[in-house]
Amino acid sequence: SVGFKAGVKEYKLTYYTPEYETKDTDILAAFRVTPQPGVPPEEAGAAVAAESSTGTWTTVWTDGLTSLDRYKGRCYHIEPVPGEEDQYIAYVAYPLDLFEEGSVTNMFTSIVGNVFGFKALRALRLEDLRIPVAYVKTFQGPPHGIQVERDKLNKYGRPLLGCTIKPKLGLSAKNYGRAVYECLRGGLDFTKDDENVNSQPFMRWRDRFLFCTEALFKAQVETGEIKGHYLNATAGTCEEMMKRAVFARELGVPIIMHDYLTGGFTANTTLAHYCRDNGLLLHIHRAMHAVIDRQKNHGMHFRVLAKGLRMSGGDHIHAGTVVGKLEGERDITLGFVDLLRDDFIEKDRSRGIYFTQDWVSLPGVIPVASGGIHVXHMPALTEIFGDDSVLQXGGGTLXXPWGNAPXAVANRVALX
């Protein structure tokens, strides 16, 4: 006479539904699943769907109070990964109702929150997400986007040039400002705070903001071009971050920056809204990304983090370089670069794009090529990244034999 039978039951009975037709409003995910030996792929795929939506390990009486069919994630397709033994791509569909509108934080909590520690899996990697139009529309997205940025800066038909001020830690604010001035005066469009420059004892944020702004306006007057310096507003609390953003706006600078993974999506979205309301461009650095995306069997691919950023909001984002690496990586990098910029992306597995994604006019993000690049890489970079990009040379500019300004000139000349 018991109402239901308790006990551990197989996930695939409920959560593996190969006959399911995906809806336009579903969020779709592609997971690379490596099951433990002896666990069938359907069970592993279903376990992922369950654990990241409504499931728990047993039947509970409260299940009877909701409509599982309406709210459960479903594993609707599984395919083996060619060339890998016992590894599969599991496709999972999540009903839209499982997610809070306009919250990238909640989306990631739901999809990747728990399931990665799951015992039945040796490893799990989220390869791609398809964000439905209905969900995209609940996000503001990037504060301005590519076209508005070009209009603000009055720079057209070429990539933008930047450089990170080195040595990244240890300069006083005044010398830091001097380095900024030299680079901008020499012909770069932007200079950048390093991602770990926040507000340390040797240079407090306010002093840095003031000296960099002075350098920026001086270079602007002398060159007749609009210049920018990414003032890093990342801080220990959201309130402190906003205080820095407000101060930047009062100084009248064009752009600030944020480390969106260490700072968190919640802080980032708040900042992006502020930037749109106050006409600031927002440059995004991806510090910590390799912790999440480096392993090919476990974690999340960077294209997922990039999609999350476009929803949360940012006008530039770092996207690696591709120069001098393998050909295959090049296609994949190009895949997520286009994913950031274009309004519509076709499914293309060779470029790592598992789903067709329609961004319905959400503004685009400019990819930033940075990390170990210098003048000689320019032709390759422009070929790969095209015009809508920021090419960021760090040590490769400042370490040039005659100092920053000539090297900045060299970068500008090489570009043209």
Swiss-Prot record:
Binds 1 Mg(2+) ion per subunit. It is found in: Plastid, Chloroplast. Its main location: plastid. Its EC number is 4.1.1.39. Its cofactor is Mg(2+). It holds the Pfam family RuBisCO_large. InterPro entries: RuBisCO, RuBisCo_large_chain_AS, RuBisCO_lsu_C, RuBisCO_lsu_C_sf, RuBisCO_lsu_fd_N, RuBisCO_lsu_N_sf. Keywords: Calvin cycle, Carbon dioxide fixation, Chloroplast, Disulfide bond, Lyase, Magnesium, Metal-binding, Methylation, Monooxygenase, Oxidoreductase, Photorespiration, Photosynthesis, Plastid. Mg(2+) binds at K192, D194, E195. One of its GO terms (biological process) is reductive pentose-phosphate cycle. The disulfide bond which can form in the large chain dimeric partners within the hexadecamer appears to be associated with oxidative stress and protein turnover. The modification N6-carboxylysine is found at K192. The active site is at K166 (proton acceptor), H285 (proton acceptor). The keyword Plastid applies. The basic functional RuBisCO is composed of a large chain homodimer in a 'head-to-tail' conformation. In form I RuBisCO this homodimer is arranged in a barrel-like tetramer with the small subunits forming a tetrameric 'cap' on each end of the 'barrel'. Heterohexadecamer of 8 large chains and 8 small chains; disulfide-linked. The disulfide link is formed within the large subunit homodimers. NCBIfam families: PRK04208.1. This is Ribulose bisphosphate carboxylase large chain. It comes from Spigelia marilandica (Woodland pinkroot).
